UniProtKB/Swiss-Prot annotation:
Belongs to the conotoxin M superfamily. Probable neurotoxin with unknown target. Possibly targets ion channels. In vivo, intraperitoneal injection into fish provokes paralysis after 5 minutes. It comes from Conus inscriptus. Disulfide bonds join C1-C14, C2-C10, C6-C13. This is Conotoxin In1696. Its main location: secreted. Keywords: Disulfide bond, Ion channel impairing toxin, Neurotoxin, Secreted, Toxin. The keyword Secreted applies. Expressed by the venom duct. One of its GO terms (cellular component) is extracellular region. The cysteine framework is III (CC-C-C-CC). It comes from the Eukaryota. It is found in: Secreted.
Length: 15
């Protein structure tokens, strides 16, 4: 999965 903000265990989509 993707997440914003990236702070958990998912794919950092904020990069």
């Amino acid at each position: 999965c993707c997440e914003w903000p990236c702070s958990h265990g998912c794919i950092p989509c904020c990069y």
